[in-house]
């Protein structure tokens, strides 16, 4: 019995040591695993298909969020000229996948807020909001940590 327990412990230790990416305390269906799985999928899509129009996005993002973003896309109303989920125009998916760092989550009522960082030199910090939808964790909103940009650039001469 002791040998069995030692083997299980050793196997678990090896598995955890070999696990790539960010060490997060997460269950198979947790806010953290949803966010990590989403960005892994999203960044690996590259130019093959526009992720917002891919039906797989519903596996990670809440239906009302996707539907509103798709409507904005159809009517050319997506804000800021940057990707909604990355908040930048150009990225290197390989670097972003390697540097993806999930920070400790904060639960506020039924919503979980997860800070997320990408990049090497100039880092991109995001705040991802996740809530339950039909029993599964889904992303409801993504914000960056830069100051308010508005819909136009501030002109002090205005």
Feature names for model-found ranges:
Residues 46-56:
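Surface-exposed patches in mature extracellular/periplasmic domains of secreted proteins
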Residues 1-10:
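Bacterial N-terminal signal peptides that target proteins for export
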Residues 29-47:
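Short, aromatic-enriched amphipathic alpha-helices that serve as compact interaction elements
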Residues 26-31, 49, 118, 122, ...:
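Extracytoplasmic/periplasmic, Sec-exported soluble proteins
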Residues 26, 61-122:
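Surface-exposed, charged secondary-structure patches
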Residues 14-23:
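C-terminal segment of classical bacterial N-terminal signal peptides
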Residues 106-115, 120-127, 133-134, 139-158:
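Low-complexity, intrinsically disordered terminal/linker segments enriched in charged
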């Amino acid at each position: 019995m002791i040998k069995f327990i030692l083997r299980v412990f050793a196997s678990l230790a090896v598995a955890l040591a070999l696990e790539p990416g960010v060490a997060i305390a997460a269950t198979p269906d947790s806010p953290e695993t949803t966010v990590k799985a989403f960005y892994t999928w999203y960044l690996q899509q590259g130019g093959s298909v526009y992720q917002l129009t891919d039906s797989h996005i519903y596996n990670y993002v809440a239906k009302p969020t996707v539907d509103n973003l798709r409507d904005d896309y159809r009517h050319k109303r997506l804000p800021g000229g940057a990707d909604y989920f990355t908040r930048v125009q150009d990225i290197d998916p390989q670097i972003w996948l390697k540097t993806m760092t999930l920070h400790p989550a904060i639960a506020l009522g039924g919503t979980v807020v997860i800070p997320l960082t990408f990049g090497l030199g100039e880092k991109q910090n995001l705040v991802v909001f996740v809530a339950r939808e039909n029993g599964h964790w889904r992303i409801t909103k993504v914000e960056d940590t830069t100051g308010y940009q508005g819909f136009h650039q501030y002109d002090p001469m205005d």
